[in-house]
Structures are given as structure tokens and as C-alpha cells.
């Protein structure tokens, strides 16, 4: 009973006694032994207002990021330093690079004042001035002599007002000696020990007591109140852990429910396919019979009247077996890849004459050197690969194979036999095994072609792969890099998992090597960059590609939207064994980091991404520019208040103004709240604009009255999820060549609302991946990676003000409500900028919660006018969106296959 009274007294007197409000950490690490100390750590920073914080031993970073969050929230002029080797020790355990990369990624939002010193504690002494550290946290090795040496080495760095924290003051097993050394220090200086969660000792080392810590210091000499701070912060820690755990449980439940719904949908789809498979033979037979009858009728003798014969011909064409059941499948909402491949085969048969003409026209085109490193493939698969090259419709090629000391004698026999029978097959036998890079370079050394095509020793080329590559070269003589779509081939020869890629997409490439196969490079360019480098095995293609793009212009990179390469995906294949090696992931990360250093002149950290062989560049911010967040609204206070409070309370980036544009609110509680919020937070302004609703005009007028270098257009029905959302978007918007930056938006139930806009989807523009489960990786992991899109939604859009002004802002005459953000993005793109979508700026979006839907005749008429404008201005109905692929359907949002359209392109990218 007495303990309960103490808790109540603490709650009632905390502001009087401790003088500083509490906050909860945003960063949650279930591994941390510091969890319950998080609120105290943040309180300490607010109370002490240190000039410099140093943490010795950071590991996962929970305690350190508590300090950083408090610095950012309080807008303090504090420098923070985390010192760690990030290799581990006997007590923390030893670990790999993944923890350091994770810490680097989270630190990105604090780079303005936070530095990670990857050094020993002794080495880091040279980085810190004497008498400059106000807060030191000692959490390194825990043996008595180690903690004693760590602290005493750093005493010269401590300021006259310094406070020192020691973790694990209550642990007495495993040889820990912090408790023993803590007892010695506590006997000579004022101190407070928090005995829960391994123990945290707070030592007033400096003779001066900071003003914010004075109330706490006074309790140390007051026996009546001595336990109050411990009780107070213990309760705060328990509350934080409980809340954070509850949020985690809820998120896992939502994910589980979404997964169940996804499985249900998959089950329905399988059932539909089974039913269709049962009906298909009868439907095909019926189609063929009707087709033959109609075709015969059209050719009847004596001839039918021309109009009647034409009607029969059209009816027959609709039932042509060449079309098979493809349109039916597509109309039912799905398209199997097997059906698409069948359709391509039939369509190519129909185009045989045109293909032959193309081959004849290009027969004097450039020599293509197909480069293949060889090491112990299955001899049968090696033969298949060679035959796929020899079967090319384009004849001006050579096959350059470098055997990397294969131990299977059958491999050598196969290579020698082919070299003897076909002079275009050239083989070099290496004297020592040098792995993929050296073997590829040996093949390149004997290559004589103007272009080099890269092929693995067990993969397959489409028979028309090279002629279609040469068609691009013929249309674009300055082409330097050409890539195609690809699929996989499994045991038994089944083709699957087709990857229909976007056109050149720099930001996607910085996240993953989406270009992959088939890659064709200008031979002089390959030699200029030094071909493949040793030390990047497993990511050697990615490394060379990155070095090549440094020397070419974007317009010299071309994409053929056809599957011309089949990647062998069987156990033991070159691709499978290569990607199974863990060092390949790290090699790719290093390749990108070096590329960014060469191209920017800066050290830009790169961390491993959320999926294997993916990466995230931690783009730095250039200072902390003022961001003007523009939010138009009208009444619906419950929605607006949630938006504003989430931005003010959860956003790590501190230098922003929030401009609420009131478009004629009349509700009393809304008007009252406007006055309250303006008076309580200096960052908030309310602009009155009572004109008839015109989304574009409201935003344009607010931007004109804003002060920020960066503009953020935000709807009044969003809620912040990721505290670093604005830091991420600002850092991207500051990059040279970047225009609009879009966020990852979720519906309240966790499904995807926005992950980039595809032009042409649904006729004008639509959201790709709409309604996907929130944790889904998306089409070839595109929900997890930054990438360029033609457009992003202005429900949360960040752009430099100078770019916004240069393109004329939003179109307030033709696009008053719908599509004005799409139009803005397309104008920005036409001005030469890339628009970027990022998955690391996450918010909820209730979508039209305050404005409503197009549910009146007037609104529907206005919407039709805006659709017509977009079709006239941007030809959205015929827009080949470079972020999409013509093999994917425009009728749906989920990147499903379209009906097969295998044609010989006249419009080449």
C-alpha cells in the first residue's frame, strides 16, 4: 500500500520536482538491456542540455538514439559521438557488419549533429577536445579493470558540469565488475543508481550542477524523497516498454491478418485456374471448329458479297486459334506466364516474314562478342547454352568462352569440339582458376566485337536476342548499354518468374541490380573502365555496370522490353551458386559505396537493404533547410488534428513551418482549435483562404506565402509512421537532378495506398501495388526499394521551391482537384528532373477523409474535364511509362501480365 502511495505522489509532483517533461523513444530494440532506461535517458538530455555527448559502447544503438532523439526534439546545440568497433566482445557477443549498417541507417536522420566513430575507446580520445564532454555513457567491456580504465582515460575530456552514466551496475555474474567500480565512485561523488534492468548508475562528476538537474540533485540529500526519482523513472520505463510491446503485437496481428487474406485470395485464384483448365480443351475445340467454318464461308465459291465476306473474316479473326485462350484469361483478371509464352510463340510465327526482313536489313551490323566464363557446368547445359547462341537469327556474332580450369574433362571436350566445328566459337583455357571476374576478363581479351554481351555458362538466349539488340544499335548508334527483360528456366525446361523491367531507372539500380541479364555493353567502354575487378566476386556484374554508367549519358542506356534471356535457376547453376555466397551481398554494397564516392566526391555510406542483394544509400542532408509543410483543409477537425499532432509530435526533422490553409471552415470547434494551435506552437500558421475549393490554387497561394527552401505538400488526412520521414524526403530532394519526392502511404488497415504512380494505369494514372499488404515486397521487391517514377502523389510530396516555381506550380485553371499532382510531376520530369519514390518515408493516409468523393453530377463533370485535359496534354492513354513495362497490364494495379503483344517495335527506347 505504501508503494502505491509513493507512485501516486510521484506522479502528482513530477513537474515540481523534476522540472522537465518525459518523452518516449521512437526507436525500439527488443534486444536492448537499456529499454526501461530510455525515458530517463531522454529526460537527462533535456535537463542537462549538454554541449557534447559521448557514448562508449553503442552496439545496436538504443541508448545512443534516445540521446539523439532528445537532442533533435529539443533543437539543442549538442554534438553526439558514438564510439564502438561494432565487432562485439565476450559480454555482448561477436557479430558481423549488419549491426553497424543498421546503426548507420538509423543515424542518418541525426547526421547534422551525430557522428559514429568506428574506433577503440582509446583511439577516439584524439577526436574529442579536453573538458568538453557534458554527458559520458560508459557501456563497453564490463570487467572491473576494463570499465575502470575506460572511465579514467576519459576523465580529462569531462567538463566541470559533467554527468557520467554506467550501465550494468547490478550484474554480478559472468565476471562483470561494473558494480564493484561503481561502489567506489558512488562513495566519493553524488550519485543515483537505478537498480532495474541490469542497473544504471548516474554520477555527478563535475563540481557544477546544471540548472535542469538541480531538483534531482536536491533529492539525493533528502531521505524523504530519495526514492522518488527511481520510482518515477521505473514507472516511465515500464510504461514505455508496455506501449512499445503492444504496438509490436498489434503490428504482428495486422500482418498475420493481411497474410491470411492474401492466402485466401491466392486460393481463389488457384481454384479459378483449375476450373479454367478443365474447360479449356472444349473451348479450344469449339473455337477451332467455328473458326474453320467462318474462314471457309469467307472464301466460299462462288464469292460472297464483299461486305458479307468481310464480316465472316472479322468473326473468324476473333476466333483464330492463334489467339488461343489468351484474351479470355486476361479478361478474367489474370494471365499465366505459360499462356503468355505460348502466345508469343504464335505471334512470332505470324511475324516470321517481318523478322526475316529485319535480319536481312541488319546483316551487316556490328559484330557482337558473347562472353562466357566457364567452370564445371553440367555438360548438357553447356551444350544448350552454346546451341542457343548458334541458333541466333542474327549471324554476325562470336562466342568467346574462357574455361577457368574446369575439373570435369567432359567440359573441355565439349568446348574443343565446338571450336573445331564453328569458327565463331573461340575458346581460351586458363592455366589457373581465377573465379568469375578473371575468367570473364580472359574471354573479353579475345573478343573482337564492337559490343560485348554477357552470358552465364548454363543460361539461354532467345533466338532473336541479338537481332533485336542490333536493331536498337542501328536506331541509336551511340548506344553504350542495352538490357532486356529476362525469365528463369527450371529443371524440365519450364520457364517462369519473368522479370519485366522498367526503362533506365537510376534510383532503382542504386537499390538492386535490376538490369542483370541480358546486358550488352559497348566494348570500348568495357575496356575503358577496366572490365571486371577482382575482389567483387558475386557482384562483379553490378560493379562493372556502376563503373560504366559513370561514363555514359542516360540517353545512351536502352531497354528492350522483351524476355530475351533465360536464367538457369536449378541447384548448382552458375547463377544459383554465385548468389548463394554471402560475401556477394557485401561486395555489391561496397561497389555502390565506391561508385557514389567517385560520382559525388563525398563519402556516402551504403547499408544492406531489406532483402538479399539490395542496398540503401544514406544520402546526407545539406544543412537543415527550412521546410514549408502545406496542408489545405476545411473543418473535419478530428482528421486534421490527428495529422498536425502526428507531424509536430513524431517528426524528427526540426526545421519546418506548418502552414494550415483554412478553406472556409465554419465549425466552432475547428475555428477554436486554429487559435489554440497557432498560440501553442510557433511553427504553426493558419492562412485563411475562403475561395471555392480549388486544391491547386490553395497550395499555390500558400507556397507563395511560405518561407521554406523546401516545400512539402501534405494532405490533411495523413499520420506519421516513420519519425524520419521528412529527413529522408528532404535528403533526396536536395540531390542534384531530383524533382518530386514521394512517400510510402498506407491505408489505416495497413494495406498500400501509394507506392508510386504509373501513367496510363486505368486510362490516366493509377497507383501501382494498390491494396498490397503493407509488408509485401511487391513486384520484384519494388515496394522495398527507392526508385524513379514518372509521378508520385501530393498526399505527401516534397520538392525544392525553386523547381516548384520554375514549372509554374500546380495547374489551377484546368486541374482544380484531380491530377494536379500528376501534372506537376510530369512538368518536373519534362524539365529534366527525376521524380523519386522512397519506402523509408512512411505515413498513413485516410484518403479523401475530409474532401469526400466524386459523388455529385457537378463533381463528376469536373472530373471528366480533368481526365480529358490529361489525355490531351500528356497523351496518358498512349503514354509508355518508363517506370512500368508494356508487358504488364494497364487495367489493374498489381503488376500482372498483359495479353501477349510480341511485335517488332518501331518505337525503340
From Swiss-Prot:
One of the Pfam families matching this protein, by short name: Glycos_transf_2
GO annotation, biological process: single-species biofilm formation
Signal peptide as annotated in the record: none
Plastid listed as a keyword: no
Keyword terms of this UniProt record: Plasmid
InterPro entries: Glyco_trans_2-like, Glycosyltransf_2, Nucleotide-diphossugar_trans, SAM-dependent_MTases_sf
Protein name: Uncharacterized protein y4gI
Biological source species: Sinorhizobium fredii (strain NBRC 101917 / NGR234)
Lineage: Bacteria, Pseudomonadati, Pseudomonadota, Alphaproteobacteria, Hyphomicrobiales
